[in-house]
């Protein structure tokens, strides 16, 4: 049967012949020409202009040869999983040896065995290059996805199919306790290259690869990093926004980095150039140190409180007022801090405060001993907006000896009370699993006596009795012991004003929206905002303006105190 001819009208159309859904299910995204060219420039700066003649080059996930198709090489090997890609790109890099190869599953024979069915798939020239320790560059743009939790991309790609990461290399990485890094496809590709370097004792090899930056910064990549640093030395790197790749979000960054065989000395800090496309050219717009928390205290560790042995059952919430489970929490808790992961990108949707346990876990109990730290870290995480440059920056334990630390901490208490992700609430007699529960709001900031006075003034018997039979809440008592900045005090003042001015509407609101339990004396601001929005929305607008002043004052201190670098 004759081979079917595939017509290609322009290089930009090559990738469109590969089914888009299929590519995304595997986490594959192909390299734009402008970034492929820049990668060649970086390699030339490191290895010299003649590197294409002096080095063997292997792109082991070549796709339709975007990385190499516009250049000539003395000895180039291109392999990919899909035969269709080889057919489409058959007329490109005709000097290359192109072959189908499942890089994450098929064995590569070592020095002890050069025969066997699997070994036959590797071209003889490439086998000889490995055996003879020839200078070699592994030049790749591997798939980025992970099916478990797309922390790299914040689901910008959608999830990849669950089976995509179930490879031989995945099993090898899991056996070495690499954790979540083992499910990540680009980490699997790089680890396979590390294995090849070790197996063949390669001393003059380089890895040049595109990837997200999480492999350098993320806590879940600790073991993977150690393996990489024991075998390769960082030479150079750039970071750019992912949206320069087709149909990808602009909220996170992609990197291209170059590594040489050797041992990395500084394992915590890596100087990258920040680049962007300006006037159809790639320009350096800044520099940035990518860092990890491997040898220092992370923010998530800093805020943890030693768990007590005394646990109590409590209802778990999925938002401020909806119960979705039951669990155990320390008996001295005053709330719960949802603190998922430890980087900027996860602060958007995975950081919050609750008056009881949260059904999604990934957080810490809040008690008197870690209350200030909780508020400080919560504020540091919510104050910084995620972007493609900072998305994978990790939070650190702050400099507590800094002159502004206590001021920031005091401000953060107020900031935390009124942030949109602060889901503190007061709930009474909620039923779950045939039990009735009361949830007290220890984050309430006003005095019991003032609420009693308001209840008497507006004939709200339920609220009066609820307060009268209770005690002062923790945060109110805490606020009596600290001094607040003018900006923080202004927020407290207008929040108090909202409570006082909207109190007369509580009975009416409760009839329409009983689920908010607005007559509880220690209602959280989440509940009070709902009341205010319905009856006095102009007050909320004024509140947001005052709250923004506090936020703007605090934001630079996140970096001054070294929560972030």
Outline where the language-model segments fall.
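Flexible, glycine-/basic-rich loop-and-beta segments that form/coincide
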Residues: 251-317
């Amino acid at each position: 049967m004759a081979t079917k001819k595939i017509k290609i009208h322009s290089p930009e159309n090559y990738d469109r012949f590969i089914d888009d859904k299929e590519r995304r299910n595997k986490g594959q995204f192909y390299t734009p020409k402008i970034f492929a060219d820049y990668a060649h420039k970086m390699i030339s700066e490191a290895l010299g202009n003649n590197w294409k003649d002096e080095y063997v080059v292997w792109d082991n996930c070549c796709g339709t040869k975007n990385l190499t198709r516009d250049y000539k090489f003395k000895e180039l090997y291109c392999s990919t999983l899909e035969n269709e890609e080889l057919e489409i790109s058959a007329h490109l890099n005709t000097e290359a040896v192109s072959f189908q190869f499942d890089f994450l599953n098929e064995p590569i024979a070592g020095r002890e065995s050069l025969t066997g069915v699997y070994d036959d798939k590797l071209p003889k020239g490439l086998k000889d290059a490995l055996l003879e320790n020839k200078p070699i560059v592994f030049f790749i743009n591997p798939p980025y996805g992970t099916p478990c939790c797309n922390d790299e991309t914040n689901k910008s790609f959608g999830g990849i199919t669950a089976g995509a990461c179930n490879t031989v290399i995945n099993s090898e990485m899991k056996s070495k306790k690499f954790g979540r890094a083992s499910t990540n496809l680009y980490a699997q590709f790089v680890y396979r290259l590390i294995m090849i370097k070790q197996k063949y004792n390669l001393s003059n090899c380089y890895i040049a690869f595109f990837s997200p930056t999480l492999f350098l910064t993320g806590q879940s990549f600790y073991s993977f990093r150690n393996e990489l640093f024991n075998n390769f030395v960082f030479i150079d790197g750039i970071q750019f926004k992912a949206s320069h790749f087709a149909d990808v979000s602009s909220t996170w960054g992609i990197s291209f980095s170059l590594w040489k065989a050797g041992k990395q000395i500084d394992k915590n800090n890596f100087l990258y150039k920040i680049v962007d496309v300006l006037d159809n050219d790639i320009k350096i717009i800044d520099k940035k140190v990518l860092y990890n928390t491997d040898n220092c205290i992370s923010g998530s560790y800093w805020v943890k409180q030693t768990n007590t042995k005394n646990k109590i059952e409590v209802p778990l919430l999925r938002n401020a007022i909806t119960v979705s489970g039951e669990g155990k929490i320390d008996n001295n808790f005053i709330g719960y801090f949802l603190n998922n992961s430890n980087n900027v990108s996860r602060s958007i949707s995975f950081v919050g405060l609750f008056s009881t346990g949260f059904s999604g876990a990934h957080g810490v109990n809040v008690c008197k001993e870690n209350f200030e730290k909780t508020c400080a870290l919560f504020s540091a995480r919510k104050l910084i907006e995620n972007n493609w440059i900072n998305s994978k920056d990790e939070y650190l334990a702050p400099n507590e000896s800094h002159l502004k630390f206590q001021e920031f901490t005091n401000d953060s208490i107020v900031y935390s009370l009124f942030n949109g992700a602060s889901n503190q609430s007061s709930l009474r007699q909620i039923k779950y699993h045939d039990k009735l529960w009361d949830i007290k709001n220890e984050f309430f900031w006003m005095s019991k006596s003032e609420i009693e006075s308001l209840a008497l003034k507006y004939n709200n018997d339920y609220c009066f009795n609820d307060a009268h039979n209770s005690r002062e809440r923790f945060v109110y008592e805490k606020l009596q012991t600290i001094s607040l900045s003018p900006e923080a005090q202004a927020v407290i003042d207008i929040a108090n004003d909202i409570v006082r001015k909207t109190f007369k509407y509580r009975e009416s609101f409760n009839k329409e929206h009983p689920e908010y339990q607005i007559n509880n004396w220690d209602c959280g601001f989440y509940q009070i905002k709902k009341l205010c929005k319905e009856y006095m929305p102009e007050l909320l607008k004024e509140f947001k303006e005052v709250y923004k002043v506090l936020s703007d004052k605090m934001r630079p201190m996140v970096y001054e105190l070294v929560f972030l670098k």
